[in-house]
A protein has these predicted regions:
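Protease-domain processing segments flanking chymotrypsin-fold serine proteases, especially trypsin-like
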Residues: 2-85, 93-94, 98-105, 121, ...
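Chymotrypsin/trypsin-fold serine protease catalytic domain
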Residues: 107-111, 115-121, 133-218, 259-264
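Structural detector of coil-to-beta-strand junctions
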Residues: 60-62, 75-76, 149, 211, ...
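Catalytic nucleophile loop of clan PA
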Residues: 77-78, 160-162, 219-241
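Extracellular collagen-like Gly-X-Y triple-helix signature, i.e., selective recognition
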Residues: 244-276
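Structural recognition of the beta-strand scaffold that forms the well-ordered cores
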Residues: 62-65, 84-85, 100, 137-138, ...
Length: 276
């Protein structure tokens, strides 16, 4: 079964095409409009399965991305008052001018919070597809995000990545593999998995660029629509939802971008500011 990223595929007109088993990975130089529907063997996509509704007051840095019609397709996380981090495959899924960041909105159907456009996009230069790692990007927004940013895990925070550490994944994605998307922010607690175990699950797993989290028996995971969202320990960002095989499958943990490997990049990019 092909692995998949955890982003919802949108047609240029905004119609949803994504299914639980086949979702696109936008490769280098490709757009969401031209990407193939079946993902390459190296990569896979997530919503919170097995979790619960969460209060945005507890996770004010959790945000999501939409197209111009308001269709949510990925998650993201506030890292400064003017920038959010997300997955590279989310940032590349459509032109910057057609992408919005929605913050401070627990229920997607409400009109609260801040809805802002993107003025600048930075994608990790080595990114080619989620299964190869480097699946991280920073979006600089127009205006100010008046919410608490997440802390960024650094190279010295290795203890946060200890196997068994309980982390929280957040998102508005599907609540079952192939099921309905959530209107509300959801959270789930998942333990970090050993690198050895994750390598057994996924032959292309790279412990320098990725981290795995999930239960051996499955049941709790990110899913389609959660890509780009945060994996946190306390209020420290340690991972970005990237890929996996199915959602909440036994022996197939979720794979996240290892934030500490890109801390310097994030620190540099979150201070970039383009007005207008």
């Amino acid at each position: 079964m092909p692995k998949k990223t955890r982003r919802n595929l949108l047609m240029a007109a905004g119609a949803l095409l994504a299914t639980a088993l086949f979702v696109p990975v936008v490769s280098s130089g490709a757009s969401a409009e031209t990407a193939a529907v079946v993902t390459p063997a190296s990569a896979a996509q997530p919503n919170i399965v097995g979790g619960n509704e969460a209060k945005l007051a507890d996770y004010p840095y959790a945000v999501y991305l939409t197209d111009l019609d308001g269709n949510q397709f990925c998650g993201a996380v506030i890292i400064s008052r003017t920038a959010v981090a997300t997955a590279a495959h989310c940032a590349l899924s459509m032109p910057r001018t057609k992408m919005h960041v929605v913050a401070g909105r627990q229920d997607k159907r409400s009109g609260g919070g801040v809805d802002t456009s993107v003025s600048r996009t930075w994608v990790q230069p080595d990114y080619t597809d989620p299964g190869q790692g480097d699946d991280i990007a920073v979006l600089t927004v127009r205006g100010i995000l008046p919410y608490q940013p997440a802390k960024i895990a650094g190279q010295s925070d290795s203890e946060l990545y200890s196997p068994g550490t309980k982390a929280t994944v957040l998102g508005w994605g599907r609540i079952a593999d192939g099921g309905a998307r959530s209107d509300y922010l959801r959270s789930a607690v998942v333990p970090l998995v050993t690198d050895r175990s994750c390598t057994t699950s996924y032959g292309n797993y790279d412990p320098k660029k990725m981290v795995c989290a999930g239960y051996e028996s499955g049941g709790t995971d990110a899913c389609q629509g959660d890509s780009g969202g945060p994996l946190v320990v306390g209020d420290t960002l340690i991972g970005i939802v990237s890929w996996g095989e199915g959602c909440a499958k036994a022996g197939k943990p979720g794979v996240y971008t290892r934030v500490s490997a890109y801390a310097d990049d994030l620190t540099r990019e979150m201070s970039a500011r383009i007005l207008g």
